[in-house]
């Protein structure tokens, strides 16, 4: 009997690098998507922090009226933001090398484009990295599918909406008050509250919160006791244990009697699929709604839809909402518009039916 020993050829430097990139033994998985994700997210984060603290005012409307967004120019954490790039730039790609100087790039809001482009590439890669790690571990791929909902929402407000409106100045500002301003102006121009897809998104987010609270409270209330009265019940669970840590039959029985039998899940797998799918589908619809409103396919308009026998308008809540929308419309970008299109396009309404008599 002959035994042959063959020494394995040493792996090349590139092969070792590939093995390290795709290794699931690393404390934090890198992956091929991570090779692009890490530098783009670091770039976006660094530029955002610097711009939020120190960026000079930006001529967002393209009318030579800069808007200050950084902390050093008088803002606080609530009012501060990275201001979107100028309407004078429009949809043009505006990297640093396209500007005549760094001052011009800052004045026209170049950092906003730098942040959102790197951020979007980064979150796309994060989603791909979730799939990649699931694949390496032999898991099913639904984690990245769930994350696609916030990715779609971010893409809608940072990319699709500016494309539809024709300028990155219409993108969502990167700050707290800026986000609220974006929401109010969006309502004024697109009536998003009356769009069915936004309604589905509200049902998804609020419903998801409700279902999460219901599930967590039911599980916590039906834990299998493994500890004494003087210990925390959390000590009754050991990571990786095979036994169920709560009694699903008890939880099912409680909820089935609280509402009715078929309102309660008797299958843990279908329950958790439902908990994951409900908010994801809702946010998908909202992102789709924003993406269609980007091209001015707006929410329902029920203004002045009810008339009496004399043809006079009987106001509904839709008309009250429309009054609020017009108020938002006339207040935003005040110096960029001569008059809001929504008001200028309507029929002329006489201020007085007859001239007043003036008695000298």
From Swiss-Prot:
Q: Which residues does the annotation say bind a quinone? A: 215, 264-265
Q: Which chemical reaction does it catalyze?
A: 2 a plastoquinone + 4 hnu + 2 H2O = 2 a plastoquinol + O2
Q: Where, in this chain's numbering, is [CaMn4O5] cluster bound?
A: 170, 189, 332-333, 342, 344
What residues form the membrane-spanning segments? 29-46, 118-133, 142-156, 197-218, 274-288
Q: How does it sit in the membrane?
A: Multi-pass membrane protein
- Entries under PROSITE patterns matching the protein: REACTION_CENTER
Give the record's cofactor note, including how many are bound: The D1/D2 heterodimer binds P680, chlorophylls that are the primary electron donor of PSII, and subsequent electron acceptors. It shares a non-heme iron and each subunit binds pheophytin, quinone, additional chlorophylls, carotenoids and lipids. D1 provides most of the ligands for the Mn4-Ca-O5 cluster of the oxygen-evolving complex (OEC). There is also a Cl(-1) ion associated with D1 and D2, which is required for oxygen evolution. The PSII complex binds additional chlorophylls, carotenoids and specific lipids.
Question: What positions are marked as the site Cleavage?
Answer: 344-345
GO MF entries: chlorophyll binding; electron transporter, transferring electrons within the cyclic electron transport pathway of photosynthesis activity; iron ion binding; oxidoreductase activity, acting on diphenols and related substances as donors, oxygen as acceptor; oxygen evolving activity
Task: Describe PTMs of this protein.
Answer: Tyr-161 forms a radical intermediate that is referred to as redox-active TyrZ, YZ or Y-Z.
GO cellular component terms, alphabetically, are: photosystem II; plasma membrane-derived thylakoid membrane
Q: Where in the cell is it found?
A: Cellular thylakoid membrane
Instruction: Read off the Gene3D superfamilies from this record.
Output: Photosystem II protein D1-like
Instruction: Please list the residues that bind chlorophyll a ChlzD1.
Output: 118
Q: Where does the chain bind pheophytin a?
A: 126
Q: Which residues form the propeptide?
A: 345-360
Can you tell which superkingdom this protein's organism belongs to? Bacteria
Predominantly, its location class is membrane
Q: Name one GO biological process term.
A: photosynthetic electron transport in photosystem II
Q: Where is this site: Stabilizes free radical intermediate?
A: 190
Kindly state the subunit structure of this protein: PSII is composed of 1 copy each of membrane proteins PsbA, PsbB, PsbC, PsbD, PsbE, PsbF, PsbH, PsbI, PsbJ, PsbK, PsbL, PsbM, PsbT, PsbX, PsbY, PsbZ, Psb30/Ycf12, peripheral proteins PsbO, CyanoQ (PsbQ), PsbU, PsbV and a large number of cofactors. It forms dimeric complexes.
Q: Per its record, how is this protein called by name?
A: Photosystem II protein D1 1
Organism name: Picosynechococcus sp. (strain ATCC 27264 / PCC 7002 / PR-6) (Agmenellum quadruplicatum)
Q: Which gene encodes it?
A: psbA1
